[in-house]
Amino acid sequence: MTNSNLRTENHFDYVKITLASPDRVMEWGQRTLPNGQVVGEVTKPETINYRTLKPEMDGLFCEKIFGPSKDWECHCGKYKRVRHRGIVCERCGVEVTESRVRRHRMGFIKLAAPVSHVWYLKGIPSYVAILLDMPLRDVEQIVYFNCYVVLDPGDHKELKYKQLLTEDEWLEIEDEIYAEDSTIENEPIVGIGAEALKQLLEDLNLAEVAEQLREDISSSKGQKRAKLIKRLRVIDNFIATNARPEWMVLDAIPVIPPDLRPMVQLDGGRFATSDLNDLYRRVINRNNRLARLQEILAPEIIVRNEKRMLQEAVDALIDNGRRGRTVVGANNRPLKSLSDIIEGKQGRFRQNLLGKRVDYSGRSVIVVGPKLKMHQCGLPKEMAIELFQPFVIHRLIRQNIVNNIKAAKKLIQRADDEVMQVLQEVIEGHPILLNRAPTLHRLGIQAFEPKLVAGRAIQLHPLVCPAFNADFDGDQMAVHVPLAIEAQTEARMLMLASNNILSPATGDPIITPSQDMVLGSYYLTAIKPGASVPEFGDQSRTYAGLEDVIHAFEDKRLLLHDWVWVRFNGEVEDEDEIDKPLKAESLSDGTRIEQWTYRRDRFDEDGALISRYILTTVGRVVMNYTIIDAVAAA
């Protein structure tokens, strides 16, 4: 489409990341203007003119290459307004279009000498070293101009293909070759730097090497076999993606759009600029100097030193600090390279692409909510009113409490009781999603029924903590509101915490008591050493039921670890119970009493149980009563 206001939609199945060929790099940056002029190459290290504050031509912010810095206005000001759309100014060569093109138009730097891509050279594993079947140290010696490499041994008997030679060794061989009595006709060819590396990679016939490797693998064992498989895997990937190994050596470097590496003016006339501009400037300066030295036929040692410096400048641009000394700025801070911008938590992917802010979401610290049910969470009122505001406004209008949205918002700001009542109705049965970063498995996001709570912290049931890998030492969690009925249904059916009891990885229960719960359960049921055991019938320590013990404990007449006799007609299991009762007594009314270590039973004439009193602690009564109460409620 010619109209730049219209956005085209491209439907695609997948995104593939492969090595870019030199032609592809040029394609990204090179454009043919409507007047037939080809632009795209950045040749000057300048950014902006400090008097006019306009971008320098052919520099890192050039308007001819990247587009105008002001909407519908060329560099020299001859053409202004949208009516000149698409015209290329004959004076300055800038196309009249929108300034936002400076966010996606790229340029390129044509290098005076090839340079190796530091990711493939110094990455782990080093793909260059694997492909060439050479040690990484040797490859580095070649790239950084420390050693020559034999590209063609010719007729020389002592030289081998890919053999490394020091400067002195090569000088000796040269003297031997050019001696008057030399019998060598085909002279050996050696190379140094990324040019030699490129030649070695160009000489690789991937299909033949892959075939040979397959034969070698079938007859190899152990470490050698593993090494061959590793090399074959890399070669197969190159073949499958139609990429050439020599593309790991760069002839041109893409220059990213200027609005992605901006330069802004601060108060007082100073400028703040992206670190990338400094790194690009180093590359351009060294590249231009190398081109000039090659033009004037400078001595080989000077040219070689300049090529090494260019290699180091490109390394710093792509991944500063990966090799050699880290390039630092004015205040001794390492400059952020392209890799630093992409990788890590603050990188482009995790921060900007995967970590986008979304509507109807919030974030707060989590605290324990022991009184919640497992499928519930405590949502602060302040957060709930903000998250569910559209639902609250809709209900306020529908119930004729207010007439319009503006009045509803005023009512919400005052936090009237009516609003809280409506909010309570809205959240009833509306699940919310809780997420704790990092979300390493599907249980990192679960659905809960919200309960309004005071304060500003989200309350979480302690049993769901293992699934989130959460604890209450300052962890934060994000809240998301599913809006559509389908999303709410899915959250309730599939994501509710009470439906996710087993770990999807192992099948073992992930809802297990831990930490505070285990300690609390132990403390509640522990027996205090030396605590006095009352005789049966002691009025202050004998109770008719579990509730009476609970009431006595709440009234502070009993302590948690006090022994009590309590009537309990349920089943009692005790591993320490002896086979026979300690004491058995028949009464005159025909009933029989049996005294055991921890219980006292009374039976009628037919042997049916009339009453049972058990000896236990107050804490154990509390525990038992709580479990019975929870089971009955379920």
Curated annotation (Swiss-Prot):
The species this protein belongs to is Prochlorococcus marinus (strain MIT 9303)
Q: Which cofactors does this gene product need?
A: Mg(2+); Zn(2+)
User: Which reaction(s) does the protein catalyse, per the Swiss-Prot or TrEMBL entry?
Assistant: RNA(n) + a ribonucleoside 5'-triphosphate = RNA(n+1) + diphosphate
> Which Pfam families does this entry report, sorted A to Z?
RNA_pol_Rpb1_1, RNA_pol_Rpb1_2, RNA_pol_Rpb1_3
Q: How is the cofactor bound?
A: Binds 1 Mg(2+) ion per subunit.
GO biological process, alphabetically ordered? DNA-templated transcription
User: HAMAP family, alphabetically?
Assistant: RNApol_bact_RpoC1 (MF_01323)
Name the positions where Mg(2+) binds: 471, 473, 475
Q: Name one GO cellular component term.
A: DNA-directed RNA polymerase complex
Q: Please, which domain of life does this record's source organism belong to? A: Bacteria
Protein name (record):
DNA-directed RNA polymerase subunit gamma
Sites binding Zn(2+) sit at 74, 76, 89, 92
NCBIfam families assigned to the protein according to its UniProt record, in alphabetical order = PRK02625.1, rpoC1_cyan
SMART domains named among the record's database cross-references: RPOLA_N
What's the stated role of this polypeptide?
Answer: DNA-dependent RNA polymerase catalyzes the transcription of DNA into RNA using the four ribonucleoside triphosphates as substrates.
Q: Which family does it belong to?
A: Belongs to the RNA polymerase beta' chain family. RpoC1 subfamily.
The cysteines joined by S-S bonds are: none
Sorted UniProt keywords: DNA-directed RNA polymerase, Magnesium, Metal-binding, Nucleotidyltransferase, Transcription, Transferase, Zinc
